[in-house]
């Protein structure tokens, strides 16, 4: 299998050729400097053979394709993996890449049976249990994160960027969700790293969730984010020039280059916090705004956001912006997040 991968240095092609798994793990060396380990389909680790002393050591996870039709993050990760495999770039920090849902990539759909980004932190085993491939894969991805982070000292910085693109356009093209982390300050350095990636808008979440980034944050104290890099497009239709900042900064991060970050400044980024999550209670749930409304569209107090079960869902704050509206989710799941400005968060 090593020859299959190294013939063209295309880990995405290798993954899609084995969407449901590989027979066994394999590993090999790059030069005298890096141990490469393929743990599963879509799971590849680059492990430097010597500890990098020019910077504090980091443990970096880059994940994509938790939703199979979000292609730009897949292309970003695959390009970096190819540069590592061809030794154009050398990993100085331990780095794990995760291509989340290969069958959904084949299917060109967000998921096959169930939204995988609602299946972490043990949600995969609740209710019906491990009854289909996406639940089984979510559990496996958790296990790979645990294996990776626990393979290095716990006092080293742990980072996890779960890369996505959004279903609809956005007033802020690139934004990131900072998972709920009670008792821990938010990292100004991480916010400025994301800003250097072109991600100039941060949402502070207000409660535990079952997303991949929350799992890494809550279980391993990782600096973890769900990073939205634009709008969903099919393979071949992404304008990759729009992701050059992201590609450059992720490459610098993995390769140990100086990041050259500015000091944290709230004036350089847009900061929001989630004020509430509206879950679907009835099948007739319907939004009161246009289907094409952009993420971060704003509404004023008293406006009708949605109707369901004969009741109106009203804007409660002086102004609320919305992200991720989706009326088609199953009853009980989130239909939209409502946001307010967040000028006074605990950022250090």
UniProtKB/Swiss-Prot annotation:
Cofactor: Zn(2+)
UniProt entry tagged with the keyword Chloroplast: no
Domain of life: Bacteria
Family annotation (InterPro entries): AspA/AstE_fam, AstE_AspA_cat, Aste_AspA_hybrid_dom, SuccinylGlu_desuccinylase
EC number in record: 3.5.1.96
NCBIfam families in UniProt: arg_catab_astE (TIGR03242), PRK05324.1 (NF003706)
General function of this protein: Transforms N(2)-succinylglutamate into succinate and glutamate.
Family the UniProt entry places it in: Belongs to the AspA/AstE family. Succinylglutamate desuccinylase subfamily.
Protein name in UniProt: Succinylglutamate desuccinylase
UniProt organism field: Shewanella denitrificans (strain OS217 / ATCC BAA-1090 / DSM 15013)
Gene: astE
């Amino acid at each position: 299998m090593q020859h299959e991968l190294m013939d063209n240095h295309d880990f995405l092609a290798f993954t899609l050729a084995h969407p449901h798994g590989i027979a066994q793990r394999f590993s090999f060396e790059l030069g005298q400097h890096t141990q490469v380990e393929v743990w599963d389909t879509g799971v590849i680790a680059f492990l430097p053979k010597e500890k990098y002393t020019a910077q504090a050591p980091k443990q970096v996870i880059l994940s994509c394709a938790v939703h199979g039709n979000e292609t730009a993050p897949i292309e970003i990760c695959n390009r970096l993996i190819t540069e590592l495999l061809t030794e154009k770039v050398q990993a100085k920090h331990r780095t794990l890449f995760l291509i989340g849902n290969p069958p959904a990539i084949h299917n060109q759909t967000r998921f096959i049976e169930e939204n995988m980004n609602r299946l972490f932190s043990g949600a995969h085993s609740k209710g019906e249990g491990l009854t289909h491939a996406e639940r089984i894969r979510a559990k496996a991805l958790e296990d790979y994160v645990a294996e990776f982070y626990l393979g290095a000292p716990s006092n080293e910085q742990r980072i996890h960027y779960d890369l996505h693109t959004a279903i609809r356009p956005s007033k802020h093209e690139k934004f990131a969700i900072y998972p709920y982390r009670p008792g821990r300050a938010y990292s100004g350095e991480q916010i400025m790293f994301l800003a250097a990636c072109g991600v100039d808008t941060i949402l502070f979440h207000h409660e535990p969730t079952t997303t991949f980034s929350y799992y890494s944050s809550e279980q391993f104290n990782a600096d973890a984010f769900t990073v939205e890099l634009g709008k969903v497009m099919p393979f071949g239709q992404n304008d990759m020039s729009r992701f050059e900042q992201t590609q450059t900064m992720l490459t610098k991060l993995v390769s140990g280059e100086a990041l050259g970050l500015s000091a944290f400044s709230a004036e350089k980024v847009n900061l929001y916090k989630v004020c509430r999550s509206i879950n679907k209670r009835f099948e007739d749930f319907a939004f009161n705004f246009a289907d094409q409304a952009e993420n971060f569209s704003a509404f004023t107090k008293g406006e009708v956001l949605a109707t369901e079960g004969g009741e109106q869902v009203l804007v409660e704050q002086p102004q609320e912006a919305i992200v991720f509206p989706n009326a088609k989710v199953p009853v009980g799941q989130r239909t939209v997040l409502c946001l307010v400005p967040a000028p006074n968060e605990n950022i250090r």
